[in-house]
Regions:
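Non-catalytic surface loops within mature trypsin-like serine protease
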Residues: 106, 139, 286, 300, ...
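Short, charged/polar surface micro-motifs in flexible loops or helix N-caps
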Residues: 8, 32-33, 287-290, 376-379
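DNA-contacting surface of Y-family translesion DNA polymerases
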Residues: 2, 175, 183-327, 337-339, ...
Length: 485
């Protein structure tokens, strides 16, 4: 069974503010570069959708109600709904703050059938929270997710055994999980427009020249075959944070402070889960939407801010040194219109890294920065030798004290001088304290769910439909159960 909480953030805003009921509600970053996190179905009638620039949404729906995300509240309601689902089954695989798979094999015998079971769960959620959800029941995860999306909002669709291919046959190939615009274009060029066209093939061999190693998965899903189990205990492979800036960054010191901020947030998230990361990567987007990334594997897995920060600076400077005269050729460009580029001379800024690493100015305005830590595990790293620097031990003790203080007095109660400068100094990104808290909340909201990258500046919360289609960051079941609806 797949459960999706319809227009979750917007629905909570309408629930908490009855005067919003029946009106278009748009939740997201409210700056000129903000992005829609989600919107009510009333807003969708105007063409507004998740991941749309807020400026575009305001043109389409000028009379809409625009709301800044309240992540504490959304997570509170999400926890309540997940608790309700646990009343029906202990086998739950969270996909995000508002979406999950439930293993309900055999449970339909306790009701008059699968549809009655789905109705019971939906009614229970509405009774306890006042919110509607959509549910899909099917023999496997792919079909269950597809079913939950067929009759939104407040949908309840059952795909019984034996009718998998019949239901899928008339649907476009873009409904296959993992088929994006590029793969869709390739398949269509090969004559495959609907799932029935793929179903007509005896096996995946005809697809291999088109999509390579994706062929078997695409053929199986088009035929309703999906053996993935519900994973009740999943390993998070990566965490990340990125921010789109209302004003482009052009100063090396400001960029340094941003990496310090990201490293601080990610290290805390790792320590809360007792995880260590093996790989650090940075993402850079210029004002013309040229985007490039670099990564480095650590000698020893870490959960420390200074390690992530220093590695980010090393990657940044390496990127700058590689491309001192022009933007990266290998970078992909978004389809958004290009902006003017202002070239500036490289200069060095002394950064606050304990290793004295210098931070270089960018070759042009920076629209977005991101930092990701991946290759996560629960292994506690050992010192390589007795002669290692005592810095890590000192940092561990300091981090433990700061974590304890923040758990008692809040995320923004204790702040290093560098982070204070980030929010209040001349080179930093000024924000009100309430905005800082919202940014922190947005970044940590899904720590108990799927691994996500959260844009703590403009997007605030990743689009849930996008998260559901990017499960590369989640790997390996720890506990699995066989499905037999």
């Amino acid at each position: 069974m797949h459960v999706d909480m319809d227009a979750f953030f917007a629905s909570i805003e309408q629930l908490d503010h009855p005067e919003y009921k029946g009106h278009p509600v748009i939740v997201g970053g409210l700056s000129s570069r903000g992005v829609v996190a989600t919107c009510s179905y009333e807003a969708r009638k105007f063409g507004v959708h998740s991941a749309m620039p807020i400026s575009r949404a305001k043109k389409l729906c000028p009379d809409g109600i625009y709301v800044y995300p309240r992540m504490d509240r959304y997570k509170e309601v999400s926890n309540q709904i997940f608790s309700i689902m646990k009343e029906f089954t202990p086998y739950i695989e969270p996909l995000s703050i508002d979406e999950a798979f439930l293993e309900v094999s055999g449970m339909s015998t306790m009701y008059s059938g699968p549809k009655a079971l789905g109705r019971a769960i939906k009614d229970r959620v509405f009774e306890k929270t006042g919110l509607i959800i959509s549910a899909g029941l099917a023999p496997n995860k792919f079909l269950a997710k597809l079913a939950s999306d067929l009759d939104k909002p407040d949908g309840l669709v059952v795909i019984p055994y034996g009718r998998e291919k019949e239901v899928l046959a008339p649907l476009p190939i873009k409904r296959i999980w993992g088929v994006g615009p590029r793969t869709e274009k390739i398949l269509k060029a090969g004559g495959f427009h609907l799932m029935r066209h793929i179903q007509s093939l005896p096996d995946e061999s005809s697809l291999i020249p088109l999509v390579g190693n994706q062929a078997k998965r695409i053929w199986e899903l088009a035929n309703g075959i999906d053996d993935r189990p519900v994973e009740t205990d999943r390993k998070i492979q990566s965490i990340g944070a990125e921010e789109t800036y209302e004003e482009d960054l052009t100063d090396g010191r400001a960029i340094e402070l941003e990496f310090r901020y990201f490293a601080n947030r990610l290290s805390k998230r790792l320590r809360r889960r007792s995880l260590h990361g093996h790989t650090v990567s940075i993402k850079v987007r210029y004002d013309d939407f040229t985007t490039v990334s670099r990564q480095k594997r650590l000698d020893t897995p870490s959960d420390q801010e200074h390690v992530f920060f220093e590695t980010a600076l090393i990657l940044w400077n390496k990127l700058m040194q590689d491309k001192t005269s022009k933007r990266p050729k290998e970078s992909k460009k978004d389809t958004e219109p290009l902006g003017a580029t202002t070239k500036v001379k490289f200069t060095n800024f002394k950064c606050s890294s304990s290793k004295g690493i210098t931070c270089m100015d960018p070759p042009g305005p920076i629209r977005l920065l991101g930092l990701t830590v991946s290759g996560l595990d629960e292994e506690v790293p050992m010192q390589d030798s007795l002669f290692d620097s005592p810095q890590d031990e000192t940092e561990d003790k300091l981090a433990s004290v700061l974590d304890s203080l923040e758990s008692k007095f809040g995320e923004t109660a204790v702040m290093s001088g560098a982070l204070w400068q980030r929010f209040h100094g001349d080179n930093g990104i000024r924000r009100k304290r309430s905005e800082l808290k919202a940014a922190v909340d947005a970044q940590t909201a899904q720590d108990d769910g799927a691994s996500t990258k959260v844009d703590v500046g403009s997007t605030k919360e990743a689009n849930q439909s996008i998260i559901a289609d990017t499960h590369a960051s989640i790997e390996g079941p720890k506990k699995t159960v066989k499905k037999d609806l």
